[in-house]
């Protein structure tokens, strides 16, 4: 790769590579590695590597792993334009919701379960839907159906990650939901900022155009759990990414 007649020593990659690798990039001089592009990764694979790490650390500190990682499963080969695929996906979602309800009853969690239905590939936030029953998937409007099926790079989605919805407990003084975003350097949680979305509730997808971002310096109150639970989870996730990378 030549830039203005020179070969760069280092390239910071700000492209999720959903559409495929970029010609001329050498993994040795690029971070993050182009090998980790979404053209060959799946969200479910990350959780497959993360879950054993969560289980190990949970045993060490004496808590149930569910407190650190939500439940999920993958529904594959679902062309939602076909009624049979929509019916099958709805049935799978209802079975999963029933499983979550049983767990909540056992643990004394006083709320009804919610699940996210999302593309198993890529980072695009448009095709994420929150549902509380399989019937909602059967009654989708054409517009919502197209959103759910649309992937970044105009690729249709056929593999869906069905993920337990976890309420966002962090709030601003005005009551807007807040979620942390962590930067890591050499595997250590090093810096934080926070996504705030006044147009969403505690169970909604905060990654939408109505979101704005607040640095930890602007509101130090958000940092209450930064150096313990948030740091622990982000560093475990980075370890899982390392295992993903090694497996590619």
Residue ranges and their predicted role:
Residues 28-33, 75-76, 119-121, 212-218:
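Short acidic (Asp/Glu) and glycine-rich catalytic loops that position anionic groups and cofactors
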Residues 1-111:
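Conserved N-proximal alpha/beta basic substrate-recognition cap immediately N-terminal to
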Residues 2-4, 180-183, 237:
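Short acidic loop-to-beta-strand element that houses the catalytic metal-binding Asp/Glu
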Residues 56-61, 76-77, 81, 162-163, ...:
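A general structural signal for short secondary-structure boundary/capping elements
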Residues 11, 95-101, 107-114, 121-126, ...:
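Phosphate-binding site of ATP-dependent enzymes
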Residues 1, 130-131:
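Short acidic-hydrophobic, aromatic-tinged amphipathic segments that line or gate anion-handling sites
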Residues 59, 65-66, 83, 174-176, ...:
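Amphipathic, soluble alpha/beta structural segments
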Residues 188, 195-248:
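C-terminal active-site "lid" helix and adjoining low-complexity regulatory extension at the edge
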